[in-house]
Amino acid sequence: MQPRETLVIDIAKLKTHGMMGYSGAVKNLFGVVPGLLKPELHSRYPEKEPFAEMLVDLCEYVHPDFSIIDAIDAMEGDGPTGGQKRFVGALVGSESPYEADMVGAKLIDMNPEEILVLKNAQERGLCAGKLSEIEVLGDDFENIVVYDFKRARSSSIDFTTRVPKFMQPLAKRILTPYPKINTAQCVGCGKCAESCPQHTITVREHKTHIEYSKCIHCFCCHEMCPKHVINIKRFSLFDL
């Protein structure tokens, strides 16, 4: 580690994430982006792969000296704000945010290859290609892996790439998870509309409405809703 005038320590909470599936050391650095610029970046990179590439670019720019993932009490389900607390009982620390995330992902029984930021970093040669290539000190984390950790509903396998190209727009419209407002509990505060990068959300008569034809499925509304009344819905077959 080269000496620097400023020491950057990245402290993240291990969570599931509605858009990216997993949130740890790398995704946490999106927090350095000023508030109003976040929706702009979501709008500029509406698809998961380009967004993941942007997160890796950001990580390389910030270049944290040390990354810590708090996985003592993690969040499962529809994170990063609408999930439930789940005890894992671990702290992960590394000079590499990517390798910290590889271990963090394993703790909740996620394959690092499923996580797009790690896949992108591995393709660039920024971290180990496999978890077995990382020297892990301390407790044997294999003994504390939570195998029934609930994932975000939107992070299901993307089947749209498995159909013929001409059918993908229709398949995406049918199969892609989407935000659904519980209008009975919505208080019309407008926080979701403020956070929406595509300006698809309006508040009328103290109730929120989404214009789904313009929705890019970034789930910023789900993340920012202070009342947690915006849920992530998906094709019902995934729940069978």
What are these regions (language model features)?
Residues 185-188:
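Flavin-dependent oxidoreductase catalytic cores
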